[in-house]
């Protein structure tokens, strides 16, 4: 399932990653994870600069949403070196729970795209407002410090969180910025 900027109309090959959620029925064995990761590393070479970001989750946690959400495997460019230097360790340890998945599932549920498999509404339940809000709140917790390193990213992210908090809007960062500009224009007039 494709989510993120690629489905929200604001993909930028120089700034965006490709966000994917892969849904499986059963637990994935480490040998299969290793084979899969070897393919992912090769595919990542053809991806945009920020690469691929993907998580493998079990269907059961999508239908009966669990928060924080368990995952079978996760990959992003941030973890590439770990996998390349110690693939067995990576495959054995890259499993757990991730609060960020609530945000990803929400984007999929409302705006995602099926690349292969069942219809979104057959696989994913709607994430509760509380879980989604906590997920996006966790994403901005360090904003006061992070804004010095990535001001545009943080400001746009803050705008989209506020758009959800105030109006229940599921927005991309770009849309969050546009929403905020509209709010500021309203206040100015």
Regions flagged by a language model, labelled:
Residues 4-42, 51-58:
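Catalytic metal-binding acidic patch
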Residues 10, 188-189:
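Short, compositionally biased low-complexity segments
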Residues 143-149, 165-168, 186-188:
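Terminal low-complexity, intrinsically disordered regions
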Residues 24-28, 146, 162-164:
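A generic structural motif
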Residues 169-188:
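Short, charged amphipathic alpha-helical segments flanked by flexible coils
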Residues 33, 38-148, 155:
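Conserved NTP/Mg2+-binding pocket subregion across the NTase superfamily
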